[in-house]
Amino acid sequence: MFSFFPPLCTTPLLKFAYTFLLLMIYSVLGWCSEMIYCSAGQRKLCEKRGFLNGPICPIYGHGALVVLLCLDGGCKNPLLTFLLGAVLTSLVEYVTSYAMEKLFHMRWWDYSQYKFHLNGRVCLLNSTLFGLASVFLCHFANPPIALWLTDLLASGVAVPLSLILLAVYLTDIVLSVRGAVQLSGRLAKLHAIYGELSEKLEAMKAEARQIVHSKLEPLTEHGSELAARLESARAEAQQKLRALYDHQNVFERRLLHSFPTLRSIHYPEAMKKWKEYIETRKK
């Protein structure tokens, strides 16, 4: 009979330490798996993956815990573990995608280019891989890891280690969330800059048309004046863009690298132009 907690977990603190360390282990293993998978697909070492700054993807850790808890450590039939594991982990991924989109108004990943996807949040390929990972987790990986953690509990190291890791984990979450919020705010400012420039350009176009139709003033003189104003408006916009770029922090930059398909819900065009501008600054 499977029991999620070993017999040594007799207090809430010990149960927390055991659960949190499992979460950390599978989050790190998940991050390693994603790095290997993405690097193999690109045939080169890919940019660091994940929302957090550390080598960790909590979505994998939470997915592993959900599978272990809901399947009582795994079904006797590996095929059933595969099917249920695929469903459970896909549910975790879908909910995470939806929640992060609502929180930050950005689409962090999109599987629309894959066949058999659901709203671009989950796809059959990943669900199949998650199902296989669930079989490996329940029938091979978790038993020895659980034994190792039991020894760690017995040694008295598990509780202080879990508290230290919790402090680091929460700090990482705060910094990453702050970076995402700042990135969202930066896109709003970028949208305003391009909107202001567009309004000025439209006003100048209207003025130029009026001059051409009226023929009351020398066209050359007004053409030179409009060209100067246009150049001034563009220079002002470029200056604001440089200020936005110079004031972005390392956490914002990392998020853009970690999520190549990151898309803003409210400002998709601003996100596209921002990425293009960043690429031009790199050259």
Predicted regions and their residues:
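Aromatic-rich, lipid-facing transmembrane alpha helices and their immediate juxtamembrane interface loops
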Residues: 1-283
